[in-house]
């Protein structure tokens, strides 16, 4: 029997190779927590948890299951994250050009809203300054300003491409109701509420933008839990493919904004009722500080020796002898250790067909190729382009500067 309170308050890690059973285990835990009406936020990259909203009426009639797509809402307070995004996604800039970008972010204030709209505003203001540099600074050459304008344009293009990719994947699941992610700074209760499961569908977003979205989201939710008023109840954040958000320093991705945010949440979270569950097939690639804060581990089949060593390094109760058994485990077999149990226990998880999204399922690639139709594929791409164009034109008409 797993101690539910220790699971949601003292953090847990779930590791295993692809197909070993870790995601099935996560869904089973979520199923039990939903019955207790415990609030959860899931960062879902591949759509592994969309079955919850599809089966909600049948399995969870007393719960709210919300399915969100990303909306990177920012304000001038997020200028460090914005600068990192522009610097990494845009063209390579010289030091004077980077100085101009930093000064531009300081000068162009933004009360809050879409990152894309803010960058488009930066483009307009940068062009104005380039036409009349005296409005900005005599020390910055117009040529440098135009280089920054082009770099900002590249960022806009990349972000729009990611939006389109995410939209294309959502179109394949037209039966599901997707909502734009509310602003966690002003409407946290729409994301975290008693009995509510919130799933953020991140498919199509590259590591850095996804990291920025997660960082701003969790930072704002954590602030609300720190406040005396407690606008939102305690909740559990489930981070799928965690190595994308909290990579180790050896991965040379320590500049991802989500690393510092999750590090803060996982080290201080217990005091404020914000638990974290991290899931990964590569524990050796995770930030050691964050992984070591997980007081319980559930480990499935694992053959990579680096990953085996990482599981024993981060666990106080998983022994070296236990880790030697990991390569021999069958799919669905694992070991539970830490504060959720009195002593290390073997576990056998059965496949949860009732929680699989029918539109995704376990795809058979041979069947997919046999049923492939080039004409239908072209038709679908044209339909997508038209639908996305209609949505973006509506957004442009709504824009209010």
Language model segments and positions:
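Glycine-rich phosphate-binding loop of nucleotide-binding enzymes
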Residues: 1-69, 288, 336, 366-370, ...
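The conserved Walker
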Residues: 18, 206, 283
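Loop/turn-to-beta-strand initiation segments
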Residues: 36-41, 194-197, 232-236, 272-277
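Walker B catalytic acidic pair
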Residues: 45, 234, 240-241, 248-249
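Helical/strand "switch-coupling" subdomains that flank nucleotide/phosphate-binding cores, especially
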Residues: 61-179
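Conserved ATP-driven motor cores of ASCE-family P-loop NTPases powering translocation/secretion/packaging/pilus
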Residues: 88, 263-350
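Conserved helicase/translocase P-loop NTPase motor core
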Residues: 167, 171-235, 249-254, 261
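Conserved P-loop NTPase motor module
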Residues: 332-401
């Amino acid at each position: 029997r797993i101690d539910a309170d220790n699971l949601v308050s003292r953090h847990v890690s779930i590791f295993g190779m692809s197909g070993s059973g870790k995601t099935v285990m996560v869904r089973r835990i979520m199923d039990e927590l939903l019955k207790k009406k415990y609030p959860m936020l899931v960062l879902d990259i591949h759509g592994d948890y969309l079955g919850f909203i599809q089966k909600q009426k049948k399995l969870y009639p007393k719960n709210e299951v919300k399915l969100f797509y990303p909306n990177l809402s920012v304000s001038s307070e997020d200028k460090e994250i914005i600068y990192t995004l522009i610097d990494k996604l845009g063209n390579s800039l010289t030091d004077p050009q980077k100085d101009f970008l930093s000064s531009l972010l300081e000068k162009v204030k933004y009360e809050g809203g879409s990152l894309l709209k803010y960058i488009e505003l930066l483009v307009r203001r940068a062009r104005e300054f380039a036409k009349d540099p005296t409005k900005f600074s005599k020390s910055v050459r117009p040529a440098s300003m135009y280089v920054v304008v082009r770099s900002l344009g590249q960022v806009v293009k990349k972000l729009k491409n990611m939006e389109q990719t995410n939209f294309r994947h959502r179109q394949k699941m037209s039966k599901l109701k997707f909502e734009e992610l509310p602003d966690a700074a002003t409407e946290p209760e729409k994301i975290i509420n008693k009995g509510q499961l919130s799933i953020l569908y991140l498919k199509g977003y590259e590591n850095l933008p996804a990291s920025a979205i997660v960082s701003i989201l969790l930072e704002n939710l954590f602030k609300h839990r720190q406040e005396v008023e407690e606008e939102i109840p305690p909740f559990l954040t489930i981070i799928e493919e965690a190595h994308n958000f909290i990579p180790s320093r050896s991965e040379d991705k320590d500049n991802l904004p989500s690393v510092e945010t999750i590090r803060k949440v996982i080290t201080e979270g217990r005091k404020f009722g914000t638990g974290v569950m991290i899931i990964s097939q590569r524990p050796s690639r995770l930030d050691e500080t964050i992984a070591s804060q997980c007081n319980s581990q559930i480990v499935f089949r694992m053959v990579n020796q680096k990953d085996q060593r990482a599981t024993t390094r981060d666990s106080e109760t998983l022994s070296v002898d236990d880790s030697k058994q990991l390569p021999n485990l069958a799919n669905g077999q694992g070991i539970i250790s830490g504060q959720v149990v009195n002593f290390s226990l073997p576990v056998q998880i059965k496949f949860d067909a009732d929680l699989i999204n029918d539109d995704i399922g376990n795809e058979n690639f041979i069947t997919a190729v046999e049923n492939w139709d080039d004409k239908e594929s072209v038709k679908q791409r044209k339909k997508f382009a038209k639908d996305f164009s209609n949505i973006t034109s509506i957004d442009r008409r709504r824009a209010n500067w």
